[in-house]
Amino acid sequence: MTIINLIRSLLFNIHFFLLTTMLILIMLPCLFLPFYFIQMVAKIWSFILKIGMKIWLGLEVKIDGNNFLDKTVIYAVKHQSAWETIFCTGLFNMPTIIIKRELIFLPIIGFYFLKGGSIPINRSNSLDSLKKMSKMAKKAIKKGRSILIFPQGTRVPVYSSTRDYPYLPGVFFLYSQCKIPVVPVAHNAGLFWPKNSFIKFPNNLKSKTVTIKLLDEIPIGLNKNDFLKELESKTEKETNIMIEKEI
């Protein structure tokens, strides 16, 4: 890590956290307005992130495969960093996000999660928790909203094994109960923004581009083993390809 990289990371973090704080404070009245206004806040937040990456880190964002953006689906997103949570909220037109329960207790921002219709769950994967998640997801789908879930349940290191961070049954339960296609989503954001890292590493991306790719949908009707196998295979294969290109 060079001193230049440290300075760039510091400037990016100041940009992102300062503007995020300003956004959530200025937009507080949106918590009492129709859902459209929360949708607008999400898109602005995503834009703040994208502009900060461009200005301070020299990174572009490439979206590969946007043919599902006008459909109601379940987005099963690879989880490597905080980046995809923020960016995908704007990209996927404010989907209903499956989040860990602790996030709704964050000062002020927790209210935004709730107003946005996020579904807080206990990550124990208990049957009761899964049933509550499914019930709330079905209500969102009836309103025409897509669902966003992180199948491994937590942010994982870039080179981690699925033996250590398996694809959890919660995503299959959602798929089987909601009966809509699942779109696997792969990306390489973990290379520049590792889990819990204040320091960002733009030089880890040889192309200077964070790529997010929407893969072919998994149709309804598969059994648990076949579904999880296909989801893991598609997501991990494409994620590894994108990472290898940057090394």
Question: What are these regions, as identified by a protein language model?
Answer:
Residues 118-141:
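A membrane-cytosol interface segment of integral membrane proteins
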Residues 55-62, 130-131, 194-197:
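Short gly/ser/thr-rich secondary-structure transition/capping motifs
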Residues 151:
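Short acidic, glycine-rich surface-loop motifs adjacent to enzyme active sites
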Residues 20, 24-40, 56, 71-126:
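Catalytic core of membrane glycerolipid acyltransferases/transacylases, capturing the structured
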